[in-house]
Amino acid sequence: MSGIKKVVLAYSGGLDTSVILKWLAVTYNCEVVTLTADLGQEEDLDGVDDKAMRTGASRAYVEDLQEEFARDFIFPMMRAGAVYEGRYLLGTSIARPLIAKRLVEIARAEGAQAVAHGATGKGNDQVRFELAVNALAPDLRVIAPWREWDLRSRTQLNAFAEEHGIPISNSAKQYSMDRNMLHCSFEGGELEDPWNEPGPNSYVMAVPMEQAPDEAEYISIDFEHGNPVAVNGERLSPAALVKKLNSIGGRHGIGRLDMVENRFVGIKSRGVYETPGGTLIHIAHRDLEGICIDRETMHLRDAMLPRYAAAIYNGFWFAPEREAMQAMIDVSQQRVTGTVRLKLYKGNAWPVGRQSPNTLYCHDLATFEDCATYDHKDAAGFIKLQGLRIRGYKKG
């Protein structure tokens, strides 16, 4: 690709991106700058910059993006209550726009002509990275080595690494794993047969249900304008709050999901996901909305949710339709302030109490006891008017 003198690479320090780093430098005869993003994946990133430099990078950025990730990406998605195909809380999908954003910002600062990623040609991540770059910097070129090179197997990657002096880990991985503070995902290996039960190595953030405590635990989550702000009365930063709930939910085996989903590229794929803290936030937030948002606003928002979730899953975080939906959602969240009490037990979380200064719940209207506020006779006219359309349709 002519005209490329400098590339910024999303770099994890693993075999794939280390090979990509050297391959870019050799193939394009260009300078390579790396970005390693700390999104709370609980990996030891000490030395990853040194490894990048030894492998041929001219500069290596290692950045702590945890608070930005929680505040500007996880929380807006949680305010929407986004769930893909009714089950998936989008833990991998929501991380890609932030990484792409930083790639673009570093490319601008470094005067780079291109960015590069290590996503394969079969998955969703290639789409997510590249659509984000298209939105933020359409003039930048995007290099996707897995779509260009002739390295097609782990054996070939290892051979390339040995040829160029790249250190290789001898530990074989059972699964392809992706982790950040919101979730951990597992794919490949035995999971490629959808009949196989996930093995014990697929438990990282949450314990197996059989190992969860035999006694229930009660917790409270406070929200302000749709954002979680405190756990058990303790105010925490966005990232610290997610991590706190990961610890609580994980020890009760909460947030495990095993599903076959529809990738944007048209392939069905089986994934096992752990999202303990995100699951608790999602359940509590949805419950609090029940007393804070009026019916029509809630139903309008709910009608958009499949489209909103698909926008994130498919890589359209920076697209105008996602931003427009977010604006409507955030208006709906202005009243969502209050506290939800959850009961946690062996993989389950139930809301058992909720309160809000903005509650729309009226005890006098809801009670089964005698009530002067509501005249039961008024329902007859309401039902008659609602039935006009149906009676006319059936008669015709």
Curated annotation (Swiss-Prot):
Location relative to the cell: Cytoplasm
Tell me its EC number(s), please.
6.3.4.5
Q: Which organism is it from?
A: Nitratidesulfovibrio vulgaris (strain DP4)
Q: What is this protein called?
A: Argininosuccinate synthase
Tell me if Nucleotide-binding is a UniProt keyword of this record: yes
Q: Name one GO molecular function term.
A: ATP binding
Its BP terms in the Gene Ontology are: argininosuccinate metabolic process; L-arginine biosynthetic process; urea cycle
Primary localisation category = cytoplasm
Where does the source fall among the domains of life? Bacteria
Mind listing the UniProt keywords for this protein, alphabetically?
Amino-acid biosynthesis, Arginine biosynthesis, ATP-binding, Cytoplasm, Ligase, Nucleotide-binding
The entry's cellular-component GO terms read: cytoplasm
**Oligomer and partners:** Homotetramer.
Q: Name one Pfam family in it.
A: Arginosuc_synth
Listed NCBIfam families: argG, PRK00509.1
- Which residues bind L-aspartate per the record? 120, 124-125
Classification via InterPro entries: Arginosuc_syn_C, Arginosuc_syn_N, Arginosuc_synth, Arginosuc_synth_CS, Arginosuc_synth_type_1_subfam, AS_cat/multimer_dom_body, Rossmann-like_a/b/a_fold
What pathway does the annotation place this protein in?
A: Amino-acid biosynthesis; L-arginine biosynthesis; L-arginine from L-ornithine and carbamoyl phosphate: step 2/3
UniProt KW Ligase keyword: yes
Residues at which L-citrulline binds: 88, 93, 124, 128, 176, 185, 261, 273
Q: Which residues are noted in the entry as ATP-binding?
A: 10-18, 37, 118
Name the family the entry cites.
Belongs to the argininosuccinate synthase family. Type 1 subfamily.
